[in-house]
Each structure stands twice: as C-alpha cells, then as structure tokens.
Swiss-Prot record:
It is found in: Nucleus; Cytoplasm. Belongs to the HUS1 family. SUPFAM superfamilies: DNA clamp (SSF55979). Keywords: Cell cycle, Cell division, Cytoplasm, DNA damage, Mitosis, Nucleus. One of its GO terms (biological process) is DNA damage checkpoint signaling. GO terms for cellular component: checkpoint clamp complex; cytoplasm; nucleolus; site of double-strand break. It comes from Dictyostelium discoideum (Social amoeba). This is Checkpoint protein hus1 homolog. Essential in controlling the S-M checkpoint that couples mitosis to the completion of DNA replication. It is also required for the response to DNA damage. Pfam families: Hus1. It comes from the Eukaryota. The gene is hus1. The keyword Cytoplasm applies.
Length: 271
C-alpha cells in the first residue's frame, strides 16, 4: 500500500475541512486515483451525514497511489488534527506541502512535510489513522433516495445564516416550507406566536425527467442548530446550493468547482 502527493491547494482543503468538521470531528477519508472523499456519519442519535467529494486534480500534484483494492485507500482520521496541520501549512512563507502514508512505531500515520520558502524551515507532522479494509468501506454507502417531494435553490447563504442564527435562539425546531412556484419559507414557533421569513423568485433545478406541478408544496421540521451548521458552507462560496425535502429527511446539495458536498439531516417527527 502506497500513497504520496504534493498538496497544491491547501487553502481550499482547509476551508472544506473547517466546514464539514462542524458536523462531527471523526471522519472517513477515501482516496482513489480520481477523487478524495470525506465521509461523516455522526452518532445514531444525531443522524446527520456528510458526503464530500473533491476531484483529485484540484488538491494533489505528483500523485501516487497503490493498493490491492483497485488502488484505493480508506482510513479514519481526526478532522481537528488535519485542520491544525493544514492551518500551519497555509501560514505565510510556506512554499511546499507533501503528504504520504507511512508507519510510526508500528502504527499507520498520515505524514506531512511542510517546507518554508522564506526561512528554509522544514516541519514534520503526523496524524494517526485507522486503516479500513475494502470490505469495511463497502458497508459505508451514501443513502439512496427517490426524487425529492420538493426542491429549491437556496438564497444567499451568508444572509440566510444570519436569519437562522437569530431564529435558533427562539426555538429548537425550524419549519421549512418549499412551494414549487418559486417560494421558500422558514418559521419558528413560540408559546406566544411565530416568526417567519419568506423568499420568492427562487429557481427549481430539474431532477431527471420528472417535472413537478407548480401547485405542489411540502413542509418539514428539522433541528435548527443542525441546519445552522450546514449554512457555514457559505465560506466556500458555492456556485449552487439545492435544498431537497423528503418525508423523513432533508438534503442540502452544495456544488463548487470540482467539489460536491451533500448533507443529510433527519426530519423531526412530532408526537
């Protein structure tokens, strides 16, 4: 088993890690000849999942990977440890960042070599990892779902985050309504009333050949704090963010150049 590469876009990788680790710190990293994937499946009670896929050519140069499993390698790692390494690697004066898979005192680690272009300093850092077999990786699958009940392109995420941050101080439950006539609303309720915000004129991307009626709409309730965590992705300046509602979950698809991130959040079931 062999993996080594030069990290050419450490700042992009850092921003991605900083955002997805808001969901959960433990992560599965899956490296293939074409892609780098981060998979987060938080504890059973939380129910959130994140699947992040980055085109290998965006992040790595001088890339080598070899394994008995179709040249794919997968392992568990701590995202905070990776964040700290990337943070130091993106500081002023750093010119080259290399990484490779190796062993330290008999245990597998992700080894980093950080070279400073100004002082000539070389820093070595290791992140302990837990290697996974191909059989274990085969059990980790992204959920397969039918077409959503309704879906819509979200408005400016930075502004939306400010709205949701104010709402989360009022209630734990966020009511989301999507109408297929370009409307979206968010609502929180209190014992004395409710607070809502409305958006109109939003687009509906098409899923497959099925065209939904403009009269169709759906409403679900989700944990507002979990939804607020997803909105931090605005820091990556995505080109498109699609919100999909299902009976038991919502999905947020985040599209960037050569990066796709999908968040799965469970719907709150009221008794």
């Amino acid at each position: 088993m062999k993996f080594k590469a030069k990290i050419s876009k450490a700042s992009i990788l850092l921003k991605t890690v900083q955002n997805i680790m808001k969901i959960y710190n433990e992560c599965i990293c899956h490296i293939t000849p074409d892609k780098l994937r981060f998979i987060i499946q938080s504890d059973f009670n939380d129910g959130m999942q994140v699947f992040c896929e980055i085109q290998r050519s965006l992040i790595f140069e001088n890339f080598t990977i070899e394994s008995l499993s179709d040249n794919e390698i997968q392992f568990q790692l701590d995202l905070e440890s990776l964040r700290r390494v990337l943070q130091s690697a993106t500081s002023n004066g750093v010119s080259d960042i290399f990484t490779n898979l190796t062993k330290v005192r008999g245990g597998p680690v992700l080894h980093f070599i950080i070279k400073s272009g100004t002082s000539g300093t070389v820093i070595f850092q290791d992140i302990p990892i837990v290697l996974l077999t191909a059989q274990q990786m085969a059990q980790i699958n992204e959920p397969t779902l039918p077409d959503p009940l309704v879906h819509i392109l979200l408005p400016n995420l930075k502004n939306l985050q400010k709205v949701i941050d104010k709402m989360k101080n009022i209630s734990d439950c966020l009511k989301i309504m999507i109408a297929m006539n370009n409307r979206l609303s968010f609502e929180v309720e209190t014992s004395s009333g409710s607070i809502s915000t409305f958006y109109s004129g939003l687009d509906h991307p098409q899923f497959g050949d099925h065209v939904l009626s403009p009269d169709l709409q759906a409403t679900v309730c989700v944990d507002i704090k979990k939804f607020a965590k997803v909105l931090h992705i605005h820091q990556l300046k995505p080109s498109e963010v699609v919100l999909c509602l299902y009976e038991r979950s919502i999905i947020v698809h985040v599209v960037l150049t050569d990066i796709m991130i999908t968040y799965y959040l469970p719907v709150l079931i009221k008794n």
